[in-house]
Structures are given as C-alpha cells and as structure tokens.
C-alpha cells in the first residue's frame, strides 16, 4: 500500500478515510493490514494515517501510541472486511486494553460474527463499556443460553450496561422468536 502520506485525508471521518483507502488499495488488503495492526504489528506510517487520521499524526510526531493503533485496526474492520481476518478479531476480544476489547465487540455486532462464547466472557469485564458492548453484540449473535447471561446485566451497577442489556434482550427475543425468561 505505498502512497504519499500527503494523499491521506487526515481530517475526514474514519468511514470516509477507509472508503477511500478501499477504493485505492482493495478491501481485502485494507482488512488484512487492519487485522495486522489489531494483532500489534507495524503496518507503516502511511497505513497508520489512513486508519487513525489526524490522531495518528500525533503518534508519528512522538506521542505514545499506547493501544491506539490496535483500536484503529479494529475500527477499520467496521468499514473493510475479509473473512480471513475473523480469527484476529476473535483474539482481539481478549486484548489487555479495554478500548480494543470494546471496539472488537462493536465489530462482532456489525459483522454478526458467531463469537458468542467470547462475548459472554466479556459480560464480566471490569470495564463497563466493554460489558455494555458485549451485551449489545450478543443481541445480534447470541443464542438463548447466552441471552440468559445478558439478562443478569439488568442488575449491573452501570446504567449504560443495564440499558444495552435491555436492548439486547429485546433484540434477542425477536431474533430467537421466543421470550427470554
């Protein structure tokens, strides 16, 4: 994916940037390189700019990267997908950084991937945003037994987790065509 970094629309939305990258380089290549970022690999400065935009420029200018390249790799999979990256996304659900786990939950929901067991484990995550997004994703991909695990989150101390659990249960009841008792 060689390109001139000045060609990257740094201030465009992530979806717009990735759409342009897909047009230029192909969806499979963008998804593959995004998965490599998610797995902790270096995909070069230009690709980091495509997925991270202006914030990535800060890292290239010396700010600590922390977990951001992995988050951007996962987020890119919302916009560019290839089935070959599913196992990397599954592994991302157990990443040590909560923001990575949260974004991977979002991708699982968007791509409707059958990672229910991994999502159920995240219902007990120490970070409320991860629990909320795991519950939300289970609304899209969970089965009846997993719905019962989501139901327990209706008593979570965090209101956003409770809201997402309630919404997921409604979706599950419709998807599964049965009440969740």
Protein language model regions, located:
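Amphipathic alpha-helical scaffolding segments comprising HEAT/armadillo-like alpha-solenoid repeats
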Residues: 41-61, 80-94, 112-124, 143-155, ...
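Structural detector for internal amphipathic alpha-helices that build alpha-solenoid repeat scaffolds
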Residues: 4-8, 20, 33-40, 67-82, ...
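N-terminal alpha-helical scaffold/docking segments in eukaryotic complex subunits
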Residues: 1-67, 170, 180-181
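Short inter-helical turns and helix N-cap capping residues of alpha-solenoid HEAT/ARM repeat scaffolds
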Residues: 65-66, 96-97, 126-127, 157-158
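TPR/TPR-like (Sel1-like) alpha-helical repeat modules
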Residues: 151-160, 170
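Hydrophobic, well-structured mid-protein blocks that either form specific transmembrane helices
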Residues: 88-107
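Residue-level detector of alpha-helix boundaries and kinks
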Residues: 3, 15, 19, 58, ...
């Amino acid at each position: 994916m060689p390109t001139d970094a000045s060609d990257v629309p740094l201030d465009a939305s992530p979806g717009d940037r990735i759409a342009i990258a897909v047009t230029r380089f192909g969806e499979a290549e963008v998804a593959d390189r995004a998965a490599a970022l998610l797995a902790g690999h270096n995909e070069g400065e230009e690709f980091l700019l495509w997925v991270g935009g202006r914030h990535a420029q800060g890292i290239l200018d010396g700010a600590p990267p922390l977990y951001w390249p992995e988050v951007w790799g996962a987020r890119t999979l919302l916009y560019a997908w290839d089935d070959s990256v599913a196992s990397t996304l599954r592994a991302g659900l157990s990443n040590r950084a909560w923001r990575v786990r949260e974004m991977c939950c979002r991708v699982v929901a968007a791509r409707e991937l059958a990672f229910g067991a991994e999502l159920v484990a995240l219902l007990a995550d120490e970070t409320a945003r991860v629990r909320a997004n795991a519950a939300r994703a289970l609304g899209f991909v969970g089965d009846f037994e997993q719905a019962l695990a989501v139901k327990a989150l209706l008593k979570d101390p965090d209101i956003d987790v409770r809201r997402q659990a309630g919404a997921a249960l409604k979706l599950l009841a419709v998807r599964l065509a049965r009440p969740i008792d």
